[in-house]
C-alpha cells in the first residue's frame, strides 16, 4: 500500500494562513512560513490590543469627566467629585458619566451639584 501524504489538508491549512495574511506587505502575504509567523504575531498584538483598549477608554472617560466637572465648578476636580458621589450614595459608572457630560451637560451639572452637597 502506498504511503499516505497530507497534501490536501496541508494545502488547505496553507491557504487558510495565506488568506489570513491578506493585506500584509512583502513576502509576509504570500510565503507560507513568513505569513504564518506574521499571522501569529498579529494575533498576539490583537490580544494585547483588546486589553489596552479597555484601559485607554477608561482613561478617556476619566479625562472627559474631569473636564466637565471643572467646567461646572472650578474648585472641584475629578477625585473630589468621585468622592462626593460616593458619599452621596450615587453609583453611576464612568462610561455613563462621560456620556452624560458630553450629551447632556445639564444632567451632569445636577450630578456635580449633588456631589458638592455631599462634600459640604
Swiss-Prot record:
A single Gene Ontology molecular function, please?
structural constituent of ribosome
Q: What SUPFAM superfamilies does the record tag this protein with?
A: Ribosomal protein L20
Name residues in a coiled coil. Answer: none
Q: At the top level of its lineage, which domain of life is listed?
A: Bacteria
- Which GO biological process entries does UniProt record here? ribosomal large subunit assembly; translation
Q: Which UniProt keywords apply?
A: Ribonucleoprotein, Ribosomal protein, RNA-binding, rRNA-binding
Return the GO cellular component terms, semicolon-separated. Answer: ribonucleoprotein complex; ribosome
The record's annotation in Pfam families points to: Ribosomal_L20
- The protein's role, per its UniProt record: Binds directly to 23S ribosomal RNA and is necessary for the in vitro assembly process of the 50S ribosomal subunit. It is not involved in the protein synthesizing functions of that subunit.
NCBIfam families the UniProt entry points to: rplT_bact
Question: Which family is it part of?
Answer: Belongs to the bacterial ribosomal protein bL20 family.
Protein name in UniProt: Large ribosomal subunit protein bL20
Organism listed in the record: Hyphomonas neptunium (strain ATCC 15444)
Amino acid at each position: 500500500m502506498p504511503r499516505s501524504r497530507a497534501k490536501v489538508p496541508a494545502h488547505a491549512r496553507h491557504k487558510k494562513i495565506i488568506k489570513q495574511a491578506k493585506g500584509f506587505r512583502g513576502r509576509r502575504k504570500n510565503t507560507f512560513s513568513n505569513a504564518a509567523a506574521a499571522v501569529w504575531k498579529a494575533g498576539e498584538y490583537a490580544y494585547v490590543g483588546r486589553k489596552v483598549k479597555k484601559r485607554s477608554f477608561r482613561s478617556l472617560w476619566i479625562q472627559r469627566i474631569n473636564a466637565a466637572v471643572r467646567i461646572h465648578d472650578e474648585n472641584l476636580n475629578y477625585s473630589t467629585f468621585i468622592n462626593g458621589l460616593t458619599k452621596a450614595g450615587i453609583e453611576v459608572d464612568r462610561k455613563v458619566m462621560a456620556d452624560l457630560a458630553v450629551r447632556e451637560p445639564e444632567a451632569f451639572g445636577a450630578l456635580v451639584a449633588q456631589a458638592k452637597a455631599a462634600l459640604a
